[in-house]
């Protein structure tokens, strides 16, 4: 039997990981500008951390979670999303304490797991960038966090992304809207999908989020949640909209958007783009002002978003964006004969210690094959080391692009390779 990776997973090979690393580094730099620090939480959590916070009736919990009992009979789940683990960590580590500066801003990058049908940009193990901000209910936080995602897309050169915006209001507003939605949907219950018939009993707002054709038709003329917002909820949402306009970030109001997680209130948003004539959600998030309290902490406002790396890279590929990744090699040493083997290793280590990337031949190949490898690696400088070079203590170093060549002593290579690099038309990396 041939052993293969599990369905819905992928091997990310070196020629692709450089793109991932570039995107992750751009994200880190962008988040740092907004004073976010990185947090790393376990890849698995107690089942209740996810089920109770995300919602027992959500598709994530009822259909998509990877959960199991470990050898100590503890109910464990691989994390399907990043917010609940971060909130658990915020409470467990008492980041709400008065000595901790507020708001607390953190970001994470890591694997998430959901059992769903694999397709382009959607895998069972996927990678997510996410941010969470704790300690302020100021609508400026909502607008700033949305602006940060918008800036990240701009930094990466991604175009044609539309911001969809909605408000779920506070608890009282949602309660009033929930009843209005039930009253609207009950007469057409038999026309809904089986899942939405169940949702109507458990959490009717979920029907708005259904992708089934019959459900979309049913909610086309559903009442708008914006008509049920109380004064405080309206003021908060208007504040967010006003600030987005100040920041010149265009948006559309999408009253059917509810998000797939139960902990949201007030502002929710998605950045959506088109891929092969289909809508693709690139980034989504919102406000969750009761989640910290739910985990046993004090009442604390929260706002954040999650962004799928696979989807982001898919859009970058579809939009033919050339990421400025550098796979080139500074130095390649072609090695001729056993007499040069030890010296080649000594020189290449000295070059690396001075901050340069370097590679050499280890396979005793013919010189033509070694030069071909240097070209494949997009090598800037090449040196050929054989028995005569070892005897004289110097070697010819050649610019692989201009063909300029100089003779350099081993001692200079070991102590000041930067000057050699510069003489041949390159600057220190």
From Swiss-Prot:
Gene3D superfamilies: Anticodon-binding domain (3.40.50.800), Bira Bifunctional Protein, Domain 2 (3.30.930.10). It catalyses: tRNA(His) + L-histidine + ATP = L-histidyl-tRNA(His) + AMP + diphosphate + H(+). Its EC number is 6.1.1.21. It holds the Pfam family HGTP_anticodon. InterPro entries: aa-tRNA-synth_II, aa-tRNA-synth_II/BPL/LPL, Anticodon-bd, Anticodon-bd_dom_sf, His-tRNA-ligase, HisRS-like_core, HisRS/HisZ, HisRS_anticodon. The keyword Lipid metabolism does not apply. It is an enzyme of class 6 (ligase). Its main location: cytoplasm. GO terms for biological process: histidyl-tRNA aminoacylation. It is found in: Cytoplasm. One of its GO terms (molecular function) is histidine-tRNA ligase activity. SUPFAM superfamilies: Class II aaRS ABD-related, Class II aaRS and biotin synthetases. Keywords: Aminoacyl-tRNA synthetase, ATP-binding, Cytoplasm, Ligase, Nucleotide-binding, Protein biosynthesis. GO terms for cellular component: cytoplasm. Belongs to the class-II aminoacyl-tRNA synthetase family. Homodimer. PANTHER family: HISTIDINE--TRNA LIGASE, MITOCHONDRIAL-RELATED, HISTIDYL-TRNA SYNTHETASE. HAMAP family: His_tRNA_synth (MF_00127). This is Histidine--tRNA ligase. It comes from Streptococcus mutans serotype c (strain ATCC 700610 / UA159). The lineage of its organism: Bacteria, Bacillati, Bacillota, Bacilli, Lactobacillales.
């Amino acid at each position: 039997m041939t052993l293969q990776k599990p369905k819905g997973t992928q091997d990310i090979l070196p020629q692709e990981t450089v793109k991932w690393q570039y995107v992750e580094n751009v994200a880190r730099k962008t988040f740092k500008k907004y004073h976010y620090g990185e947090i790393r939480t376990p890849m698995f959590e107690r089942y209740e951390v996810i089920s109770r916070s995300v919602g027992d009736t959500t598709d994530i919990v009822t259909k998509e979670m990877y959960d199991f009992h470990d050898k100590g009979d503890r109910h464990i789940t691989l994390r399907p999303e990043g917010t609940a683990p971060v909130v658990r960590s915020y409470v467990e580590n008492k980041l709400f304490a008065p000595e901790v500066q507020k708001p607390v801003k953190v970001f994470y990058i890591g694997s998430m797991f959901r059992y769903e049908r694999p397709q382009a940009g959607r895998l069972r193990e996927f990678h997510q960038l996410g941010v969470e901000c704790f300690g302020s209910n100021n609508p400026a936080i909502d607008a700033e966090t949305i602006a940060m995602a918008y800036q990240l897309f701009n930094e990466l050169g991604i175009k044609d992304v539309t911001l969809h915006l909605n408000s779920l209001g506070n608890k009282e507003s949602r309660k009033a809207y929930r009843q209005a939605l039930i009253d609207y949907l009950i007469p057409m219950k038999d026309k809904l999908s089986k899942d939405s018939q169940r949702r109507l009993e458990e959490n009717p707002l979920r029907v708005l989020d259904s992708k089934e054709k019959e459900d979309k038709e049913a909610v086309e003329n559903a009442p708008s949640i914006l008509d049920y917002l109380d004064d405080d909820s309206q003021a908060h949402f208007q504040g967010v909209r006003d600030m987005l306009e100040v920041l010149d970030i265009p948006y559309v109001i999408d009253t059917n958007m509810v998000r797939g997680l139960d902990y949201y209130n007030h502002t929710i948003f998605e950045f959506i783009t088109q891929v092969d004539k289909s809508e693709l959600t690139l980034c989504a998030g919102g406000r969750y002002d009761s989640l910290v309290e739910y985990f046993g902490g004090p009442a604390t406002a929260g706002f954040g978003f999650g962004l799928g790396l696979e989807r982001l890279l898919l859009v970058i590929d579809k939009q033919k964006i050339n990421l400025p990744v550098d796979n080139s090699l500074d130095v390649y040493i072609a090695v001729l004969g056993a007499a040069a083997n030890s010296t080649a290793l000594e020189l290449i280590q000295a070059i690396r210690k001075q901050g340069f990337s370097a590679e050499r031949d280890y396979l005793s190949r013919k010189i033509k094959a070694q030069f071909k490898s240097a070209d494949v690696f997009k090598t800037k400088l090449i040196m050929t080391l054989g028995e005569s070079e070892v005897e004289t203590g110097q070697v010819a170093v050649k610019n692989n692009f201009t063909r300029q060549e100089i003779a350099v002593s081993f001692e200079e290579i070991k102590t000041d390779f930067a000057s050699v690099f510069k003489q041949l038309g390159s600057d220190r990396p």
